[in-house]
């Protein structure tokens, strides 16, 4: 809904051409197919990673640009339903604090932008992966399929199909939500009734 609202405002303000808006709408309509691709091809990899990481005491999630809110969402879901200490950070802040938390075997999840387009962002995220890998971190990446740099430095990769950068969060959150669900189930927690959470606030 937010995407459609944004396109509507862009049309009213003349910020985008009509064909650009239509192209974006067509891409948006294609997102369910791409999400289904992730469900069909990545579910086992996600479950296997959760089984391997089920005893981990903490996780770091890192992302740049549109990957930052994905990192925050991934960290939040793991915290909410698997009761695992997690923190989400902007990947650009890695050297200003988060890297101090990286110990041998620490799981660090990176949301990797595609190499095409703004490939400077891709290069910076790969550089961050190299840095924490050198300090013994266990790297889990969410990345566009067939990215050789990600394969080279990551221990586990949850692949996504190619999609427009601004819509990639719709796809990237899926394996992270599955990962949190699998972690919770492996710990015998009820994912439908997280403890102590209030989904509404009453002001007295």
Where are the model-predicted features located?
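A SIS-like phosphosugar-recognition module
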Residues: 1-204
């Amino acid at each position: 809904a937010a995407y459609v609202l944004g396109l509507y405002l862009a049309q009213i303000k003349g910020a985008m051409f009509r064909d650009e808006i239509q192209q974006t709408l067509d891409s948006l309509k294609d997102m369910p197919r791409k999400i289904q691709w992730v469900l069909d091809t990545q579910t086992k990899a996600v479950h296997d990673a959760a089984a391997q990481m089920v005893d981990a005491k903490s996780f770091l999630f890192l992302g740049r640009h549109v990957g930052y809110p994905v990192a925050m969402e991934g960290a939040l879901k793991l915290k909410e339903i698997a009761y695992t200490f997690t923190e989400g950070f902007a990947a650009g802040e890695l050297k200003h604090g988060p890297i101090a938390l990286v110990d041998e075997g620490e799981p660090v999840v990176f949301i990797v932008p595609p190499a095409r387009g703004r490939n400077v962002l891709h290069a910076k995220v790969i550089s961050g992966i190299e840095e924490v890998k050198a300090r013994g971190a266990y790297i889990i990446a969410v990345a566009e399929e067939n990215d050789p740099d990600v394969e080279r430095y990551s221990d586990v990769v949850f692949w996504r199909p190619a999609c427009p950068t601004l819509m990639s969060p719709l796809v990237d959150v899926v394996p992270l939500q599955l990962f949190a669900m699998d972690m919770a189930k492996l710990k015998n927690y009820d994912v439908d009734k997280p403890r102590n959470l209030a989904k509404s606030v009453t002001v007295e």
